[in-house]
């Protein structure tokens, strides 16, 4: 499965690095900030884009790694795209998968995947993620795949 991200903060960047270092294909990370695209990409070897289409079309799994209070709004945007069969996940510790309202109608599968882990920064947090515990809640039918 190919993984993409919306949101380039500590959680998104740390999970991105963890997946890459563990040979899980990552399609890139959507960010609203053009400066992040042009500057950080060269330093970190991450693929950033300001085109949500690029991330959505290439990804089987999409992580919404945005602040908790932005998840619902980002989801409202994501669900306007053809996402049938995709796994849509957020990493909030305070919100369940129900924040992805109407996901059944899109044909996608929703999950809350919360790492019980202190993300100290974008550059090194991924190194200790193998020891982290995760709570996973969402679509029961595809739980083993996620």
Model-derived segments and their meaning:
Residues 27-31, 88-91, 136:
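Short, hydrophobic beta-strand segments that form beta-sheet elements in well-ordered domains
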Residues 1, 86, 132:
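Nucleotide donor/acceptor-binding cores
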Residues 29, 125-144:
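Short beta-strand and adjoining strand-loop segment in the mid-core
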Residues 44-124:
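Rossmann-like NAD(P)(H) cofactor-binding subdomain of soluble oxidoreductases
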Residues 9, 34, 68-69, 93-94, ...:
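Alpha-helix N-cap/helix-start capping motif
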């Amino acid at each position: 499965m190919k993984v993409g991200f919306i949101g380039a903060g500590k959680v998104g960047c740390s999970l991105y690095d963890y997946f890459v270092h563990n040979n899980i294909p990552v399609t890139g990370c959507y960010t609203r900030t053009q400066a992040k695209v042009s500057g950080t990409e060269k330093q970190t070897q991450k693929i950033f884009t300001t085109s949500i289409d690029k991330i959505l079309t290439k990804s089987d799994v999409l992580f919404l790694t945005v602040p908790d209070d932005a998840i619902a709004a980002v989801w409202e945007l994501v669900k306007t795209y053809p996402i049938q069969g995709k796994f849509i996940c957020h990493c909030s510790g305070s919100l369940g998968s129900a924040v992805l309202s109407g996901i059944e109608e899109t044909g996608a599968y929703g999950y809350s995947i919360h790492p019980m882990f202190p993300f100290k920064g974008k550059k090194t947090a991924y190194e200790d993620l193998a020891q982290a515990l995760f709570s996973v809640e969402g679509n029961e039918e595809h739980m083993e795949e996620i």
